[in-house]
Amino acid sequence: MAALRLLAWAFSRRVSAHRPQPTLPHHLIRHYPTTRCGKVKFYTDPVKAVEGIKDGASVMLGGFGLCGIPENLIGALKTKGVKDLKIISSNVGVDDFGLGILLASKQVRRVVCSYLGENKLCEQLYLAGKLELEMTPQGTLAERIRAGGTGVPAFYTPTGYGTQVQEGGVPIRYSPEGHLITLSQPREVREFEGQHHLLERAIRADFALIKGWKADRSGNVIFRGSARNFNVPMCKAADISVVEVEEIVDVGTFAPEDIHIPNIYVKRVIKGPRFEKRIERLTTRDSPPAPGSKDQDPKRTRIIKRAALEFKDGMYANLGIGIPVLASNYISPKMTVYLHSENGILGLGPFPLKKEVDPDIINAGKQTVTVIPGGCFFASDDSFAMIRGGHIQLTMLGAMQVSKYGDLANWMVPGKKVKGMGGAMDLVSSKKTKVVVTMEHCTKTKQPKILEKCTMPLTGKSCVDLIITEKAVFEVDRSKGLKLVELWEGSSLDEVKATTGCSFKVCPNLKPMQQIKSDA
């Protein structure tokens, strides 16, 4: 009974994770167990913390872009000099930071990721036949990792149906001469409740290198801001998870309900000796766009002001980078729209002031952001559960091409441009989500972007509901095709027909292209 009274007293004294003082004296803590069997080991040297990672090992790297990456442990891998690594990561960072460091030192044989972003080195190595690259939709990657950590060998998802992910044939490896050597394999397809799904297999790794905010001395871990991202599911899906943190605190500092990763998933912990916490895209609202920039282009502004009319009060929406994000600037202050970011935020606010910039709070475009009161953070697997589950009412994104029947292509130009699909395939996979495409009507070479059939690899099949360009607005019927419903006053019907690569119907009640009022 005395022991029970002691424990009850300890729990009554617990505090929030944001208050670092201990809640129980050390001489009392020693009288009951605070760690599991197979005690978590603590390190001071990052190189020793990655002991056991050998040539050819599979390694998960937590983070999203440069946010929440285990930068000290990545540096230790470079120092250690292990080669032929298979890296599983959401993104590949930039050329000279994060995963880019290991690519530059030629230590990586294969990368499994969803998005290359601005890492030109990774793209060059891939196209030159010096790197294997397995592109996976971001939500599918998160779920494959989550499944690996929970003992589920495989699962079905609607993401990627009708694309090369399903059909196979996505280049994984080129020869130095540019010939295809390895291609992705087709997926098994089954139909559930009238919708096609792909079979995806779970993924595990030998090691996971994780970045947390704080750990207690029994190995429990908490994260800060949007740095939770892929760190949480990855920590659970490896034989050995190594967590670097900014601070190690006493047992009892965290209230049990505040712990994000229980110590059962953690094998090693190290307090990082230094953190650069580099920001990939510093964006603030007190830095106006330069004269002549894309943000002041009248064509883009026209699309933005029309796109803003798609927001409804109380809506949950996900916005792609560029025009969709800029459309959120026109949301009326009388309206509440909950903006979702696939890296783990619900309730995005405006870009920060310079003094408010926080490297642990970024959006899916790697831009610094703020979060509105009532907003929240979560891990990437939870984020894509919201997306695939149809809890997001609107997704707005750009496109390279859209077909007459709503097929979307926006992630790859074979042999030339390789960015990756990111979360786009997941975002367009739910039948409950309205998909709006915002884009310029033609390419820079004046070629139509609205076509009878897409010629580039698809992001989604029959998934687009509305197309907004600087010339017109089209509704998409996925069996009957396009209907022109709005026309910009400076454009003519003949001009739109001449610059559109497919036939379309004209609404009998054709309207001038609508624009939100700036003071709405």
Curated annotation (Swiss-Prot):
Pathway: Ketone metabolism; succinyl-CoA degradation; acetoacetyl-CoA from succinyl-CoA: step 1/1. GO terms for biological process: ketone body catabolic process; ketone body metabolic process. It is found in: Mitochondrion. Its EC number is 2.8.3.5. Expressed in flagella of epididymal sperm. GO terms for cellular component: mitochondrion; motile cilium. The active site is at E342. Keywords: Mitochondrion, Transferase, Transit peptide. PROSITE patterns: COA_TRANSF_1, COA_TRANSF_2. SMART domains: CoA_trans. GO terms for molecular function: succinyl-CoA:3-oxo-acid CoA-transferase activity. It holds the Pfam family CoA_trans. InterPro entries: 3-oxoacid_CoA-transf_A, 3-oxoacid_CoA-transf_B, 3-oxoacid_CoA-transferase, CoA_trans_fam_I, CoA_transf_AS, CoA_transf_BS, NagB/RpiA_transferase-like. Residues 280-299 are annotated as: Disordered. It catalyses: a 3-oxo acid + succinyl-CoA = a 3-oxoacyl-CoA + succinate. Key enzyme for ketone body catabolism. Transfers the CoA moiety from succinate to acetoacetate. Formation of the enzyme-CoA intermediate proceeds via an unstable anhydride species formed between the carboxylate groups of the enzyme and substrate. Probably play and important roles in the energy metabolism of spermatozoa. Belongs to the 3-oxoacid CoA-transferase family. Homodimer. PANTHER family: KETOACID-COENZYME A TRANSFERASE, SUCCINYL-COA:3-KETOACID COENZYME A TRANSFERASE 2, MITOCHONDRIAL. This is Succinyl-CoA:3-ketoacid coenzyme A transferase 2A, mitochondrial. It comes from Rattus norvegicus (Rat). The lineage of its organism: Eukaryota, Metazoa, Chordata, Craniata, Vertebrata.
